Amino acid sequence: MRLIDSTAKISPLAVVEEGAQIGAHVEIGPFSVIGKNVKIGAKTIIHSHVVINGHTEIGEQNQIFQFASIGEINQDLKYQGEPTKVIIGNRNRIRESVTIHRGTVQGGGVTRIGNDNLFMINTHIAHDCSIGNRCIIANNGTLAGHVTLDDFVIVGGMSAIHQFVVIGSHVMLGGGSMVSQDVPPYVMAQGNHAQPFGVNLEGLKRRGFDKPAMHAIRNAYKLIYRSGKTIEEAIPEIEQFAVNEPAVQLFLDFFKRSTRGIIR
């Protein structure tokens, strides 16, 4: 049984399999294919030639453009057809030829995407990735399996991020970056392999950070990258900054999660 809201607009040239759940005011263009285990939230627009399959849940007010593929079998050779998922939030823009693969049992079973993200043309998001809110991945950006992007991350075009890497909030990665280690929050980085080039001050200004917060973040950055100290040696001083400026706490929380070491 197909569960399609009466207000949905579905092209007669689209294929919606039995069992799919289509919310109110959803639009589905011609030659798109929606699998039987897919759930699509209200006011999401799916343009022509989109394929969404697997156990995929898509929230409200998303826009998905031509030739995007969401929920397809992942490229992990260990995958044996388990009912793993893709879960996507609200108001995301998924542009042409984007691929988002379902998770693996070993990686938690879910590829998860938050709200208000923009994935430009040819972005690839592999199995078990976790993407926060308000991130931008520019054309041809590639995320390997198990990558985490926190909130407000910008990934420049033609960049690639290695498996299990964590990218902290408010990071700006320049185009063509190859990232094989974790990138702390607030950092600008670029290169092959990616290296830090300072604090993303322009991004912080746009998001309403005040001068005391940015000053404290810069001081923490200097301790990490310019003092000659190890992370373990720098942490006590960063903790002191965090007492007066909560924004610095992101550094401390990040170091607890980091498993691959940070870029240098």
UniProtKB/Swiss-Prot annotation:
Involved in the biosynthesis of lipid A, a phosphorylated glycolipid that anchors the lipopolysaccharide to the outer membrane of the cell. Homotrimer. It holds the Pfam family Acetyltransf_11. Keywords: Acyltransferase, Cytoplasm, Lipid A biosynthesis, Lipid biosynthesis, Lipid metabolism, Repeat, Transferase. This is Acyl-[acyl-carrier-protein]--UDP-N-acetylglucosamine O-acyltransferase. Pathway: Glycolipid biosynthesis; lipid IV(A) biosynthesis; lipid IV(A) from (3R)-3-hydroxytetradecanoyl-[acyl-carrier-protein] and UDP-N-acetyl-alpha-D-glucosamine: step 1/6. One of its GO terms (biological process) is lipid A biosynthetic process. It comes from Actinobacillus pleuropneumoniae serotype 7 (strain AP76). The lineage of its organism: Bacteria, Pseudomonadati, Pseudomonadota, Gammaproteobacteria, Pasteurellales.
